[in-house]
């Protein structure tokens, strides 16, 4: 099964000139979603994770079912102000400003092996921020994964510079 057959391209979203790759169509087809999660599980297990960290919000859709399949813990990396209780944060630069990603204090024990997951890798800014946050709390980031990689953007290179191996199911060159 070709996973790309179940990913819809939406032109001019969220703004003109952008082609948005939408996993909603993949999620809507249980057979395709099952195949996708099985393939991801076979790749992610190679990173020997204790915990899977999903990036807000579509990363939750990838990390949570994989955590169940692999018998790992699951934690959420969220935008500022979305998690209850005490959090640890990491501020990072955007093209025009800054943003913040947070994790609940105590969500991951120091030294645990963590794989960070999202639906799509583009510039790698949010994924890199997640890696930095996880390292800040003492986690060992053993890998990263997404359903989609926009190979024409620098996300993979950014992860390579952070010494984080990366895997994906579908790569797009434009």
Swiss-Prot record:
Sorted alphabetically, which keywords does the UniProt record give?
A: Cytoplasm, Glycosyltransferase, Purine salvage, Transferase
Q: Where in the cell is it found?
A: Cytoplasm
Reaction it catalyzes: AMP + diphosphate = 5-phospho-alpha-D-ribose 1-diphosphate + adenine
Provide GO CC annotations from the record: cytoplasm
Kindly report, in one word, the top-level EC class recorded for this enzyme.
transferase
One term of GO molecular function? adenine phosphoribosyltransferase activity
Cited Pfam families: Pribosyltran
Keyword Acyltransferase recorded: no
Belongs to which family? Belongs to the purine/pyrimidine phosphoribosyltransferase family.
Q: What name goes with this protein?
A: Adenine phosphoribosyltransferase
Query: What is the species listed in this Swiss-Prot or TrEMBL entry?
Result: Paramagnetospirillum magneticum (strain ATCC 700264 / AMB-1) (Magnetospirillum magneticum)
Query: What is this organism's lineage?
Result: Bacteria, Pseudomonadati, Pseudomonadota, Alphaproteobacteria, Rhodospirillales
Q: Which gene encodes it?
A: apt
